[in-house]
Amino acid sequence: MIQQETRLKVADNSGAREVLTIKVLGGSGRKTANIGDVIVCTVKNATPGGVVKKGEVVKAVVVRTKSGVRRKDGSYIKFDENACVVIRDDKSPRGTRIFGPVARELRDNNYMKIISLAPEVL
């Protein structure tokens, strides 16, 4: 579960390394985000020469959470870290590579470009 002020690792090569959640999008008063949800973030740590700069406000989609998610068959999937991918307004990623595995739940929300770039879909 990702909420306001949560810091996440960025799992792409957009230039951001770490982001801080400002807001969870999707309905008024929504408190938490899970895998596949869009959040508004600010970049706290960035690589020099990247597309995204430190202090920039960006949108991102959550691809891994420590709390995990329950699937329809009753199984759970959890990851070792909270991670996101920086996206544009049309749901396409700003980076050209994705690092680490992503959850299959992204397919339900039509993030096909992220799934195709990911090295592993769990």
UniProtKB/Swiss-Prot annotation:
- Statement: the UniProt record of this protein carries the keyword RNA-binding: yes
Mind telling me which GO cellular component terms the entry cites? cytosolic large ribosomal subunit
Q: Name one GO molecular function term.
A: structural constituent of ribosome
Lineage: superkingdom: Bacteria
SUPFAM superfamilies registered for this protein in UniProt:
Ribosomal protein L14
Q: Which UniProt keywords apply?
A: Ribonucleoprotein, Ribosomal protein, RNA-binding, rRNA-binding
One BP annotation, GO: translation
Coiled-coil ranges per UniProt: none
Q: Does this UniProt record's set of keywords contain DNA damage?
A: no
Purpose of the protein:
Binds to 23S rRNA. Forms part of two intersubunit bridges in the 70S ribosome.
- Family recorded in the similarity comment: Belongs to the universal ribosomal protein uL14 family.
Q: Describe the subunit structure.
A: Part of the 50S ribosomal subunit. Forms a cluster with proteins L3 and L19. In the 70S ribosome, L14 and L19 interact and together make contacts with the 16S rRNA in bridges B5 and B8.
For this entry, the protein name equals Large ribosomal subunit protein uL14
| Gene name tied to this protein | rplN
